[in-house]
Amino acid sequence: MSVYHLPTLLNPLVNAIFNCPEPERSPLKKLFANLKTRRFILLAPPSEYLLNYHDVKSKLPLHDLCYNAEFINSYILLMTENSYINTNSRDSHYETLDGKTVVIQWKNNVIHALNGFHIRRRLKILETKILPNFNDYFEGAADFIILFIDQPLNCEFVPNDYLQCFHNYEKIPKNAHAMPNLSIDSFQQERSSFENILHIHPARLTQLGQLFSSYRTLAPGDDPSRSIFESIVQQAFDGMKSDSLFKNFSNLYDLIHDYFELNLYDDIWSRLTTHFKGHEVDTEKYKYFSVNQLLTDFYSKDYGEFKLHDITLIERRLHLASKHLQKLALTHSYAEKSKILVETLQKLSGTTEMDSHQLELPDGLNNMTMDADTLISLFVLVVCRSEQKHLKSHLYYLQNFSNNSSSTKFGILGYAVSTLEAVVCYFEDFNKNTGNVAKANTLCEKTKNLLDKLSCENPTNEVEDLATYKDILTYRNEQGQSIPSICITNHKNYILLDILSEYENDFPVEDLLEDETIDGSTLLIESIKAGNLEAAKVLIKIMLFNCTEEELVSYINKTDKYARTVAHYLTHEMDILKSIGNYIDWKRKNSSGQTPLFSIFRSYDQPNYEEMVKTAFDIANTWYRKHNSLFDYLDHTDNKGNSLLHVLKTNIPILLQLTKLDINEENYKGLTPLMVYVKYKRLSNIDAITKDRRLILEKVQNSTFFTCFDYAKDHSVLSKIGERGVKDSLFGLIYFHSLRYHNLNATTNITSVSNAEKPFATTVINMKTIQGLLRSILKDNPFTFLPLNTYIDEISHLNRSDLTIIGKTDVTSLLHQLTNCFNVLLFLKKIPENLFTDEASILYWMRINTSKRNQKPSGKENPKTMEPEEINMIQSFLRFNFDEISSFKASLNILRKVLIFINLKSDDFEDAYKGLNEMGRKLINSEASSAFKGIITNHNMFSELSLAELLENVRFLEQCTIQLSSFVQIILFEKIPNWWKHYGEFLALHKSYRKAFPNMVKPKSASDTSSRAPLGGFIETKREQSEQRLAVQIKASSKMLKELGSEIFVAHERLAEELSNYMEFRKACLDQRSLVAFATTNISVLQECV
């Protein structure tokens, strides 16, 4: 027999096991023989590892080990009956071919390599694939499951030498941490060792306890007594430094100081707060201090130099610093206090990394000069807003309870402590000046009054004496809100209009454009968030009248801390959308990866949803055209892989009209748009998308192997998607879907063409009824080319209530086969069209059919005598058909393998391209690395939809052809040769009879007797007995010939009828429903990719 070499697969392990051209000569022939009739799961590491890494122990490349049976055995999981049970409460245990134990957590997509593995690993399932069997040496299953795992299983592996050129671009693991500070780490180790020694030696603890007691006794209740604290620390140090237990500690004094501080902090802090009681800084009276009051230098700048943008950035730093300084109240040591203080000043001055939103801002505060006076003024605001109640106590502690007095005088900590001291002095000096206090009180009271009038709790919407508040109109609260912003938030629109019209010099358009809160919200964003559409329209009118197009685009696309523009907050504001839509950057994504169009599409609670969606889409389309491009659907996919189709609630025809649209695209959970619609019962969307020819109805969710039918809980939804299934079926007549279990009884939903009022009907039928129907049809058509016995057997195994991925694949395969089978039966009119209206109709038809079958006369009562000429004619007819069927079967075999490999090699091409791109980006040479970014290729020669449909039809046609060929083969090579054998024996008996009894016309009956003479009678009796024996043999041979001939005749008649049916089915299936459909679908889908 000729050896056909199929193309090599990219993954060496998959190729070694499934794609061996000569299994009898392969080094894996024993493994192939062992697995010949077994079902198994293959664990496949990524091709990147198998092709580019080698085993540490053997030094062999991993791709060479893929042809080593000992290596392969660990990757093959044998399947038992338990493999089909979905154990949500426990893990699924499997045994490898060499007896090792593997546990799979299907829910988490995790594999644990346990008993037998010398390296126990936790592996991640990257992808689950169903591989159609294309070889001839595995007979255990038509499909095999491959679990692609994130790394090799049973070996230590390292990259090959040639990967060294990629070394500098190696990926950093997600869980990798920065290198620790060795000095800090060493000190922590010493501290841990120090405390362990103290706990091991109670005597030492007792001595230290006595020192703690002496401090609590000697120190006055209102005096922290730094000198007493330092004295007992020194006393402890003197007693320990000569002790051999502590001689190896390089920082013994610091360790002792910290230990004493830890144990005496509460006592020290209590004395401190008592000591400064009545003298602490009271920040309540400065509650309404604002940036404009302290940073007078900024506000006194010339009009051309002053930028409100600088103030908004200062506000953000103030907010961060204030939040951080609040942690000071939670500290319990000098180290903690000093750390908080330094970090607060760093956040305030901008010397540390701010949040990502601030880092991306252009011309930020980092470019501003931050002198000491400015820093102190800002720190005053930080203290006021953090509401610190024991500021002097913290300052005193920082100045007096350090283990190194120089640290508070020099360096960054010294600067921080002196800044805090200056702030405390500021408050003290401020309180000593009665004029300042009076002015502050007046200003505070005035600010409070204005804010009360602007409060949402105040019903009035106007301020009669607005002029009296002119000097505080530049006030900004701790959230960074200006007076106009507060008016907008609290819907004080009349006051807002008064302010903007009467005090235009204080609020020029430039300031309105730069007015932002600490979270980056502009006035327009604030108005939309507050639902103040009137204020929004006022602002838009001002902007449109006073700003250039460039300024409008810049302002409308400003983002807040969530990277949202004003358009991301639009839900039902139709008029506003129309007025600013042309200035929106429709491709701008927020922190969740959502564009404005995406946000509008998923705002489901708006009353005019469809109109809003249509308007937004039209405006976005216009915006794309304005920028000389076509609407790009891929621009609007969020960080979770959701597309516009996934989130659109209704009116999806506006998207389905797009040409470059993947309507089967999966999000990161593996859900297609149709699955989402089915899950949330969006009937109008289901109706629209099921009419689109690009839809792949049974797209499988990779992690669970669910299809859209698994998410359907409603009969109307099942009926709707079932109708599409009928249209996609082989002859468009019937479709089996949605297998369910009720007390271990399996039922299936069947959608079929109906003659009633509705064109389709969906019914629930018990699988046992389907099984009985198949048996009844098989009795009527024993030579049918449909493999009914196979389906009957598979239905018998449907007794498992919960199915894993393995079971689901079997169920899906069975439902597909039943769909094809009953499509053919209906196409050939073997069963009535209205049979599946309900289960009672099926049972009734089966009873009637059985009754008719029992009334038919049996062919055995009148066997037909066949002549050699007739047998020759039958033999010639069957041989001709057998040769044709065999040739066609071989062609189908080749076509099936080609279709499988087109899909496999497309995936290989994609994986190889991704791997090449990934490696290219890691190249040390930056110029060479950048060259890989420009590689663009299209590996999709055929659409996924058209390939899947054609492969399924070819596989079914091949099964039918094999079934019919086996019947022809039995008659042609067993029954007819047997007839010729008996016919030859019959002729030989006749020849022997004529030779022995030439005068006999025909053999005598055994009952014929006559009287003879004694001697002559004896001879005659012997002669008659011989003649009778031959006569009996001739009669038996004749009877056998008649039975065989009758059996061949009946089989020939039925086979002739079945061959006619087969030819009719084959032509319709292959020509119209397969090749033509494949070409049509493929052309239409690929045209959209051009």
Curated annotation (Swiss-Prot):
Task: Return the similarity comment.
Answer: Belongs to the UPF0507 family.
GO cellular component annotations of the record: early endosome; late endosome; plasma membrane; transport vesicle; tubular endosome
- InterPro entries, per database record: Ankyrin_rpt-contain_sf, UPF0507/Ank_repeat_27, VPS9, VPS9_dom_sf
A biological process (GO) of this protein is:
early endosome to late endosome transport
Q: What's the protein here called?
A: UPF0507 protein C1Q_01007
Domain of life, per the record? Eukaryota
Q: Which GO molecular-function terms appear in the entry?
A: guanyl-nucleotide exchange factor activity; SNARE binding
* Gene3D superfamilies linked to this entry: Ankyrin repeat-containing domain, VPS9 domain
Q: Which SUPFAM superfamilies does UniProt cross-reference here? A: Pseudo ankyrin repeat-like, VPS9 domain
- Sorted alphabetically, which Pfam families does this protein's record hold? VPS9 (PF02204)
Query: Which residue ranges does the record assign to the VPS9 domain?
Result: 289-436
